[in-house]
Swiss-Prot record:
Native species: Streptococcus equi subsp. zooepidemicus (strain MGCS10565)
Name of this chain's protein: UvrABC system protein B
Swiss-Prot/TrEMBL keywords: ATP-binding, Cytoplasm, DNA damage, DNA excision, DNA repair, Excision nuclease, Helicase, Hydrolase, Nucleotide-binding, SOS response
Record's comment describing the protein's domains: The beta-hairpin motif is involved in DNA binding.
NCBIfam families: PRK05298.1, uvrb
Origin organism lineage: Bacteria, Bacillati, Bacillota, Bacilli, Lactobacillales
Transmembrane helix recorded as keyword: no
Gene this protein is translated from: uvrB
Motif (Beta-hairpin): 97-120
Amino acid sequence: MIDKRDFKAFKLVSKYAPSGDQPQAIEALVDNIESGEKAQILLGATGTGKTYTMSQVISKVNKPTLVIAHNKTLAGQLYGEFKEFFPENAVEYFVSYYDYYQPEAYVPSSDTYIEKDSSVNDEIDKLRHSATSSLLERNDVIVVASVSCIYGLGSPKEYADSAVSLRPGQEISRDQLLNALVDIQFERNDIDFQRGRFRVRGDVVEVFPASRDEHAFRIEFFGDEIDRIREIESLTGKVLGDADHLVLFPATHFVTNDEHMEQSISKIQAELADQLKLFEAEGKLLEAQRLRQRTEYDIEMLREMGYTNGVENYSRHMDGRSAGEPPYTLLDFFPEDFLIMIDESHMTMGQIKGMYNGDKARKQMLVDYGFRLPSALDNRPLRREEFESHVHQIVYVSATPGDYEMEQTDTIVEQIIRPTGLLDPEVEVRPSMGQMDDLLGEINLRVERGERTFITTLTKKMAEDLTDYLKEMGVKVKYMHSDIKTLERTEIIRDLRLGVFDVLIGINLLREGIDVPEVSLVAILDADKEGFLRNERGLIQTIGRAARNADGHVIMYADRMTDSMQRAIDETARRRAIQMAYNEEHGIIPQTIKKDIRDLISISRAVEAKATEAETNYESMTRSERQEAIKQLQKNMQEAAELLDFELAAQLRDLILELKAID
């Protein structure tokens, strides 16, 4: 039995008090939540301190909160900020634990079957276990997640019911505890003590929970009774203190007992028989043979080991769900009245909508060709309407809310005024004729003042040509293309801020972490070419890149005024007028943001190495050259898998294995 701790309030720690229009935004959001409003939008301009406002709301409504971001990097940044705001509460991080993941796939055109291949990040796996155990043990929990939170996770009831609860004085023999640990997927290893393992020394059992990375527990027995439970350092064995209660959650999120396993296997066998009849009736004998061989092997593994590769494909039977019923996800671990906050909702909600269809298309091919049973289709992410069914109360947070959010609610809380008094930049439109010379003059003005420039183009060729032209003109310039990885991008931004170069050119400068206070000019080329990066939302987001500098200015180069341009200019002017009126009333003089220049530390502690171009004659390489080539190939393999080019990813994987075999 899990004793959930007494309700503990969120305690926000910050040296700042709410300012600008943060106080009215916080009050409005809290009032709406407390009055039972299901959905609302926080329309916060860039740099107005939306994360701080979110933290204030969480601390005042005191509900377990799920914050969803649209990628790992952004989730990592938010996790760090919330940890600083709530040092005494449980702030957790839940993203995909795969460093590399190539899903199982079949390509009929070339009759190519590609097995699932992945590498798991142990640090992130630990953080995921920490998130689920915190949700079951306490109320003061904030989980910052990517859209991985809508993927299947296993039953929270099975997970909670399987937990082993221990107290000093409890009657339980050492062997009973060992059996209980094995049942919840802990592994005995008396030599290599790691997460999810235990070791035994006489009447002492040491257990390393899956949710910890440095601290383990020592359980000391006196006969068939627990004498004492101590928290220890896993590496040195140093005693940190006594514990009066210890709850050990399963070492994996997918757990089941023997009785349940036999029931699941019976259902798998029944489904196999039905599908074999169907294939044989259609004359698909190869598919029938393939399915029988594979499924019977998996059943044997489940009986003997309690596990098989791809066990998640049988999750419908394991969970006791009906066909088509949604899987259990992280959302099921929360209590019913929890709060959801969607960061950058204009991006995140689109991702949530698209996950299901992409997953189904790939799995349907595996089912049609006899690689998987039809029930594998129920190991999937939630549909958007299924996600909506989990929503008790939700806050969409964005500078440019999407159509979906606007359809969900009319309740919009604006946060336009920045605590620094900074204004939205002035925007002007200039003709594209002679834009290069005009732009060069504007850049030189900024260089003289020690300021920086962003230029956004629509095509790779234009970005490259412009980079070459500016270099010839003596401008220190860099082009940031889409192939650059997160940490390399951070290095480029740092160099721009330090003045190593003065101009950054890119196609999509809306990525996270590209807010640079030193940038006073943003130039938008081909502003009149309607599309993703030149629609109203894209333009407003791009304009916002100049909003962290007191002299922020935006120039759109265009031959005509599109509706998107006009709406973006009008909205920016509206916000600027509100900000100017506030500054005048309160005697505030806008000051450029002072922001420390520091390197980003990845949440997973992984360092992305710069890889050299791989040569084709691998055997003539030195060992270190081969290692560099392997890193580059792994990067290419991951990108191929993300683009669903499974054949190329499989070829690269095989090449990596060959290279590793040389050494």
